[in-house]
Amino acid sequence: MLEYAHFDGRAISLTKGPREATGADLNEQLRLRAAGEIPRHIAVIMDGNGRWAKQRGLPRIAGHQEGVESVRDIVESCGQLGVQFLTLYAFSTENWKRPKDEVSLLMRLLLTALRDETDRLHTNNVRLRTIGDVRALPSELQNELREACTRTGSNAGLTLTLALSYSGRWELTEA
């Protein structure tokens, strides 16, 4: 469960917590909405999963798997709060420089997550989009992304954008 901490006009703090939402949490959400403090767009740079795992004596992939769980929580929380757009910077062009076995594991993890989560996204009215050089990804992953985006394309709730094989340079060349 992610807990909403505070939005000060520049940044929002989301932290992972062990408890379920309480009546006080729901009242706080209503207060924030009424005050206009819910941001329209939140962007998350997904970083630190490997360090998280290393600090716990776990393999790097365990950190990435925990990252998938965190993404599920973030998407759910943003949808509940009424955030309109969520962008996840999930795999930059720099990530291609990681060891090949780690990149392969990350691609498989993303493929599995898409297969497991697309129905949930659709049910929760989330529209999935991608930005970045998706053609650089493995063809099986490209196909799954295309199918997930098509399946959720007419949803009108939260728009979830995955930035994959993405960089500022890519954005400039594609503008």
Residue ranges and their predicted role:
Residues 2-175:
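Flexible, compositionally biased loop and terminal segments
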